[in-house]
């Protein structure tokens, strides 16, 4: 145990999936932690936990935070918001119990903790109650464009990060109005994303990458990919850099 007194919360970015892309500071934090918390689907340990597998102390206490099953509820439904809010509240209190007992709790977050990371929901609930440190991680999009060897922006280019869940017309408008884009949350939205890219005249530039930097990584021109549902770890890159020096 870290000692008598209030514990410390550490949000640890685990990067895009390759364990060798963990930062030195992240590895040190794992060595200091008394408790390891991570979000996951029921019955699974999650990708973040897999990334740090070989770095954990034998006496480390693990605190998996299992998401409720909400796939049958539309995200715009009030019932979804109620269930997910209750889940994050309960997760924060589970972590707080360890912090109040003086333990250092490291919370894993795939990519970067404060960029589309579930850790954020703990951070906003606990940062005003306990000492907090956030250790940044290499983002998934950075890992993907590095894997693809795809220069994305330069000079005064604007980069837009867009969720594939947004309305098709709005997605197409934003794609037409930016020099470069990263489209996250692909999943079952792939056909819609393809149509929006075609409507904005950007389909021929788009590159699809899944599981970037992981052992089973794959990439292809989006125009050549079938409209199958994409895995969770996938995104679409649309490069800018038209006026190359």
Swiss-Prot record:
The keyword Methyltransferase is assigned to this record: yes
This enzyme's EC code(s): 2.1.1.130
Disulfide topology: none
InterPro entries: 4pyrrol_Mease, 4pyrrol_Methylase_sf, 4pyrrole_Mease_sub1, 4pyrrole_Mease_sub2, CobI/CbiL, CobI/CbiL/CobIJ_dom, Uropor_MeTrfase_CS
Pathway(s) it belongs to: Cofactor biosynthesis; adenosylcobalamin biosynthesis; cob(II)yrinate a,c-diamide from precorrin-2 (aerobic route): step 1/10
Gene3D superfamilies with a match to the protein in the record: Cobalt-precorrin-4 Transmethylase, Domain 1, Methyltransferase, Cobalt-precorrin-4 Transmethylase, Domain 2
Reaction catalyzed: precorrin-2 + S-adenosyl-L-methionine = precorrin-3A + S-adenosyl-L-homocysteine + H(+)
Keywords: Cobalamin biosynthesis, Methyltransferase, S-adenosyl-L-methionine, Transferase
EC class name: transferase
GO biological process: cobalamin biosynthetic process; methylation
GO molecular function, one term: precorrin-2 C20-methyltransferase activity
Taxonomy, superkingdom: Bacteria
Family label: Belongs to the precorrin methyltransferase family.
Subunit structure: Homodimer.
Name listed for the protein in its UniProt record: Precorrin-2 C(20)-methyltransferase
Gene source species: Sinorhizobium sp
Phylogenetic lineage: Bacteria, Pseudomonadati, Pseudomonadota, Alphaproteobacteria, Hyphomicrobiales
Name of the coding gene: cobI
